[in-house]
Curated annotation (Swiss-Prot):
Part of the 30S ribosomal subunit. Forms a bridge to the 50S subunit in the 70S ribosome, contacting the 23S rRNA. PANTHER family: RIBOSOMAL PROTEIN S15, BACTERIAL AND ORGANELLAR, SMALL RIBOSOMAL SUBUNIT PROTEIN US15M. One of its GO terms (biological process) is translation. PROSITE patterns: RIBOSOMAL_S15. InterPro entries: Ribosomal_uS15, Ribosomal_uS15_bac-type, uS15_NS1_RNA-bd_sf. Coiled coil: none annotated. This is Small ribosomal subunit protein uS15. It comes from Azobacteroides pseudotrichonymphae genomovar. CFP2. Keywords: Ribonucleoprotein, Ribosomal protein, RNA-binding, rRNA-binding. One of the primary rRNA binding proteins, it binds directly to 16S rRNA where it helps nucleate assembly of the platform of the 30S subunit by binding and bridging several RNA helices of the 16S rRNA. Forms an intersubunit bridge (bridge B4) with the 23S rRNA of the 50S subunit in the ribosome. GO terms for molecular function: rRNA binding; structural constituent of ribosome. HAMAP family: Ribosomal_uS15_B (MF_01343_B). Belongs to the universal ribosomal protein uS15 family. It holds the Pfam family Ribosomal_S15.
Length: 89
């Protein structure tokens, strides 16, 4: 499996406040970014997988909403996560 609990804890430890902090926007954005990159690679091979394409668009929307929330609440954390993950703005 591409995303196991250890991998999630790694993302939360690196971008969240602790290993079990799954609620912080930074941890969720990092997790969504990993899933988005994985689905993008899948769609390069399977071009007609429309269900995966829809789920990718939904994930991008979720990440966008979290980024907008973070930008409204704390611009410093927003800039850090954008630079750290290499997300275009």
């Amino acid at each position: 499996m591409y995303l196991n609990p250890e991998k999630k804890k790694e993302f939360f430890a690196k971008y969240g406040k602790s290993n079990t902090d799954s609620g912080s926007p930074e941890g969720q954005i990092a997790l969504f970014s990993y899933r988005i990159s994985h689905l993008t690679e899948h769609l390069k091979v399977n071009r007609k997988d429309y269900n995966t394409e829809r789920s990718l668009k939904m994930l991008v929307g979720k990440r966008r909403r979290l980024l907008d929330y973070l930008k409204r609440c704390d611009i410093g954390r927003y800039r850090f996560i954008i630079n750290e993950l290499g997300i275009r703005r």
